[in-house]
């Protein structure tokens, strides 16, 4: 059976049928429709005003590659200036190859590129060093938690370095739907309530951020890269298999097989939740250490780094953060500074506090909480 004629130009043979509309389109017409939808998303959401200097988070992967290419095509109409900002997390055997892809893209499209590294920004810590530290505490699956927080901070610092007024990232609809599922499965109502907005307005000292590909499915992002002959880095991060996101991704695929519109349904549901009046969070404060936006005394990045520097990476995640809301020690990888652990109160030998009126003060945040184990006080080995 011959392929149908393109629904748009009525001349060329169709190369695909779009899942969301059912329209059969040829390659050029699909790319034009894709770019028009991204333009409509940016204009409808008032995401990038004329004259904006936009820092594009560039990882070398398909999403950031497509985002940079589309915005480069739309830049004259939007009146914006683009600057690629890449983050070197310090992942051996992975990030070096990805950064080469970013450099190649920057040279081909004649876009300025700035690379910022975890090691320079966070006192010598790289993701490989973080992974070794968290593995020693039995929390190897938390690598992506650390990386997500630190990467966000690094991108912010890189954007400020180049004088950007806005930050854009390549999160697509599948990424957003996975995040909605993750927040729901973890019972994180706060993130559910604010996770569907197209972008932040840049409260306080933070730069405005947005996701122009939020309503573009992963399949269509890949198809756009194919028809535009875009080359990108396609290997998965070596720490990704340990992440909880993988389970949400598998669940999303099952849901999509039963209901093709499941991805966009989840994205739009999160958007409606974020627009509800009751969902508006209280205004954020500032971190007592670095001045970044924070809902506690310390921002997430500083709290995570403190846990690593004190040899207590377990306490830097979840409820343990309350223990870390104290004056932090100097930044730096402890394995490079001293082999002795930071002095902390002697942990009690019990597993739980039996006296409801006298909760444990050595690591438990409430009656019945698990105390800090003695193994947590061991120095971090490089």
Curated annotation (Swiss-Prot):
The keyword Transferase applies. It is found in: Cytoplasm. Pathway: tRNA modification; 5-methoxycarbonylmethyl-2-thiouridine-tRNA biosynthesis. Its EC number is 2.7.7.-. One of its GO terms (biological process) is protein urmylation. Pfam families: ATP_bind_3 (PF01171), zn-ribbon_14 (PF16503). Its main location: cytoplasm. One of its GO terms (molecular function) is tRNA binding. Residues 350-382 are annotated as: Disordered. Disulfide bonds: none annotated. The modification Phosphoserine is found at residue 200. Keywords: Cytoplasm, Phosphoprotein, RNA-binding, Transferase, tRNA processing, tRNA-binding. One of its GO terms (cellular component) is cytosolic tRNA wobble base thiouridylase complex. It is an enzyme of class 2 (transferase). Plays a central role in 2-thiolation of mcm(5)S(2)U at tRNA wobble positions of tRNA(Lys), tRNA(Glu) and tRNA(Gln). Directly binds tRNAs and probably acts by catalyzing adenylation of tRNAs, an intermediate required for 2-thiolation. It is unclear whether it acts as a sulfurtransferase that transfers sulfur from thiocarboxylated URM1 onto the uridine of tRNAs at wobble position. Component of a complex at least composed of URM1, CTU2/NCS2 and CTU1/ATPBD3. May form a heterodimer with CTU2/NCS2. Belongs to the TtcA family. CTU1/NCS6/ATPBD3 subfamily. This is Cytoplasmic tRNA 2-thiolation protein 1. It comes from Rattus norvegicus. The gene is Ctu1.
